[in-house]
Regions:
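Active-site bordering "gate/hinge" segments
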Residues: 1, 5-219
Length: 219
């Protein structure tokens, strides 16, 4: 939990209080079987449920010497990327909302729903999917999955330009964001910032490229 003292856009003081959302997951896992521990991973971060469960599955599979079929590896990779899009769209939409750009906020949530619908149709869950299992996945993809993913990709490409026109390319948004919350490349590396945060600071550390897993080395 972060308690902030602000002066306009400048954070003057920041007090960190740890423990408010600590749930002792590592301790809980000591008394669970390997399959039982998987239920906890989806709840670590509802915007990264697929990736968290995937990571633990890979750890267990490596320890047990389980070979995962290539089709499963492709399914896991695609699901991870859909979840990543879900996460980025929520970030974009909430940033817009915090800055009062409600039109852009609604656009972001509109398109995030399309991703969640695709995930739900195959996994049965929108946020917590419990889809990956040790050595595989709970069930094969829905018959409409491939078609809907392709349709979403074709839909989303021009929409990104629309986002830029209404928000990221807007002079008001740019003036408010420039110089606010600056994170240097050195601090990004020191703090372990990755993804979009790291790239914005000049630190392009992408584990999918540096240490490919699943089928990231092939796509």
């Amino acid at each position: 939990m972060l308690f902030r003292s602000l002066e306009g856009e400048i954070i003057k003081k920041l007090d960190v209080h740890c423990g408010y959302i600590h749930r002792g997951i590592e301790k809980m896992c000591e008394e669970l079987t390997y399959p039982q521990t998987l239920a906890l991973t989806d709840r670590l971060d509802y915007l990264g449920a697929s990736q968290n469960r995937h990571a633990l599955c890979m750890c267990i599979e490596k320890g047990l010497g389980v070979e995962v079929p290539e089709r499963v590896q492709y399914i896991r990779t695609i699901m991870d990327e859909l979840q990543r899009i879900d996460s980025h769209l929520l970030f974009f939409a909430c940033l817009c909302m915090d800055m009062g750009a409600l039109t852009a906020f609604f656009y972001g949530f509109r398109d995030r729903e399309k991703v969640l619908d695709i995930l739900e149709q195959t996994t049965g869950g929108r946020l917590i999917q419990t889809y990956n299992t040790i050595g595989g996945v709970q069930a094969d993809i829905h018959p409409d999955f491939v078609r809907k993913v392709k349709e979403f990709i074709a839909y989303m490409r021009p929409v990104l330009r629309e986002y830029h026109e209404i928000f990221t390319g807007n002079v008001i948004a740019q003036e408010r964001l420039k110089g606010t919350g600056v994170l240097t490349r050195e601090d990004a590396i020191s703090f372990g910032a990755t993804g979009g945060t790291g790239r914005a600071a000049g630190w392009a550390c992408d584990v999918r490229k540096r240490h490919p897993y699943a089928v990231y080395g092939k796509v």
